[in-house]
Amino acid sequence: MTKDKEPIVKNFHLVCIVTLIVGTIIQFSDADEFAIDMSKTGLTHVPKDLPPKTKVLDMSQNYLSELQISDISFLSGLKILVLSHNRLQLLDLSVFKFNQDLEYLDLSHNQLKKMSCHPFVNLKHLDLSFNDFDSLPICKEFGNLTQLDFLGLSATKLQQLDLLPIAHLHLNCILLDLKGYYVKQNETESLQILNTKKLHLVFHTGSFFSVQVNMSVNTLGCLEMTNIKLNDKNCYFLMKFLLELTKGPSLLNFTLNHMETTWKCLVRVFQFLWTKPVEYLNIYNLTIVDDINKEYFIYCKTALKALKIEHITKTVFIFSWSSLYTLFSEMNIMMLSITDTPFIHMLCPKTRSTFKFLDFTQNVFTDSIFENCSTLVELETLILQKNGLKDLFKIGLMTKGMPSLEILDLSWNSLVFNRQRKCIWVGSILMLNMSSNLLTDLVFRCLPPRVTVLDLHNNRIMSIPKDVTSLETLQELNIAFNSLTDLPGCGTFSSLSVLIIDYNLISHPSTDFIQSCQNITSIKAGKNPFQCTCDLREFIKTISQMSSEVVKDWPDSYKCDYPESYKGTLLQDFHISQLSCSTSLLTVTIGATMLVLVVTVTFLCIYLDLPWYIRMVYQWTQTRRRARNIPLEELQRTLQFHAFISYSGHDSAWVKTELLPNLEKEDIQICLHERNFVPGKSIIENIINFIEKSYKSIFVLSPNFVQSEWCHYELYFAHHNLFHEAFDNLILILLEPIPQYSIPNNYHKLKSLIAQRTYLEWPKEKSKHGLFWANLRAAINIKLMEEKK
């Protein structure tokens, strides 16, 4: 029973005191004020270490059995105290005498039997309901609670003057728990509930309604009753009970929670209320027992505007469906809401209907609903979400007989459209919700012509065909959670101002949408897998320049999904150079760079002789590499000279004035035939001997060298030594150019060497001499072993 009552009371409290609680909590936002939640913590006594500045204290759903002054006296600033669902049996309200700021006190769902009173001043909410009081716990001190807004009470007996101490108060809500109420048969009690706007009566669960109390309430505008169990016999008691409560013209809203009744009794209750001033009748959790047969009902003039029934359960399954549906379809009211029921159909009214609003959410209706129905001429809103609708074409035909229909909700069905035929819709529809269906691109060939708000989110749409019927009046389009790959243009939606297209497959949206949709005031396109490439730059530039009021969720919902290096990057933080994105610009840049390079190389070659410098550096590098690859011991074992010089006598002046001074100044030993050849030995023997004792053989080539026979011999033996010793010991210096035709045919060795080997060319420019000598010295530089004594 507790489980049943908790949501009921919470709902009622929400209606009655939400403003009070919110307003109070807002005042507790300062850092030095506290809200303590100790609910469901197994407390058996009030903790002693509560912060003295506590403003809100929740100790509900614990095991507290008593409350003493010392428990809360130090909480002088306490404003809200919740002690519901505990084990309190006795309570002296004087425990709160030091809590003068207390405004909200909830003592419901305890075991209170007795209560001692104490005056309060600021109390606005007092809940003593769902306790074990025999009579209503009303103290005379309650008469001073001029700010009291909500009062919750419990009693097993009622007396007419129980509420006299608070007769002068103007309450907003009274919750009266009558779960333990009992009166002997044929006895009637009276209770005058003077001034309250809302009255909530909670009866015992499982017991047939038998309360016989004459209640009268002044200014009652809202009546709510919970746990009503009726059968054909005691149905009269409910109507008798309501007779006094429904007399006043101010009762406009009547709600029944957890109602179990027979069909016959339900019809009688409807007939009873049909002539009362009640305008809004709500029934939540209705259970129909026994058979459903045709019952006579008079649809006389009524003040009732709206009937809402939410969640119907039937205990019988074989009955007259027409009797059930006819009762509701013929009602002469403006608004009918029957939701969460096993209804599979609803009949078309036989005569012109007064319905302006119909809500049949979460039933089992099929495509045959209101088929060929022409009596719903005043219907403006029709809600058919969460049913079994499948064929959109048939639904369009259904609306043909509803000339006033403006709002149609078909969401959460299984609608498809795969016909080539043109759909027929009533022309009055302005708002159409077809979200969460199975619709594809073809749906754009089956839309009402004057629709202004269209919701197609969560379908199977991949694109918007360009040849669809023009929807010139469409202002809002929600097409989120589909599979679109690009933003739609406004060619067919010239009045579009709001577009919701997030959660699609848009990777590189075009800017045509922005250009063609000049009336856009709101666009939501985040949560798409954007590919951050060159194609996206223009879109980012355009959308980032738009107002944040227009581009919703920018920039947080707009992130790169590809490539991996940019995944998760906000679009506003994605940057790529113009050069990377423009082929023509890249071509021009590369061409210009190559042109500058060619001009530079040409200048260096012509004016600075760059090739000569390159050859010299290359030769020096190769020489150093070869020298590192030859074992030092092998080079040093017989060497006495760094170089053997071979030259023509006509070139001796250059050798003595240029070559020797630049080589021998760094302890380099040069072998010259005129100073080192051994007298008495043959010239050939001296040549061979000193070539073998030299690390390198330097030949100064010129036209004079070609004409010298001894120079040729020296070259021959040096070349022979090259192959014999298996390392490179020849260095050719071209002092002057030697034309090939000037070399005698019998000097084939010289011809082949000049043709095949790299030589050092003596530069005419003096600025190049330094590099020449450095290169030559590096080629012959080696540490010679000292002669053994």
Swiss-Prot record:
LRR repeats lie at residues 54-77, 78-101, 102-122, 123-147, 148-168, 169-196, 197-219, 220-250, 251-277, 278-303, 304-330, 331-354, 355-378, 379-404, 405-428, 429-449, 450-473, 474-495, 496-519. Disulfide bonds join 117-139, 235-265, 348-373, 423-446. The chain crosses the membrane at residues 588-608. Its main location: membrane. Residues 1-31 form the signal peptide. Homodimer (via cytoplasmic TIR domain). Heterodimer with TLR2 via their respective extracellular domains. Binds MYD88 via their respective TIR domains. Interacts with CD36, following CD36 stimulation by oxLDL or amyloid-beta 42, and forms a heterodimer with TLR4. The trimeric complex is internalized and triggers inflammatory response. LYN kinase activity facilitates TLR4:TLR6 heterodimerization and signal initiation. The heterodimer TLR2:TLR6 interacts with CD14 and CD36 in response to triacylated lipopeptides. Participates in the innate immune response to Gram-positive bacteria and fungi. Specifically recognizes diacylated and, to a lesser extent, triacylated lipopeptides. In response to diacylated lipopeptides, forms the activation cluster TLR2:TLR6:CD14:CD36, this cluster triggers signaling from the cell surface and subsequently is targeted to the Golgi in a lipid-raft dependent pathway. Acts via MYD88 and TRAF6, leading to NF-kappa-B activation, cytokine secretion and the inflammatory response. This is Toll-like receptor 6. The gene is TLR6.
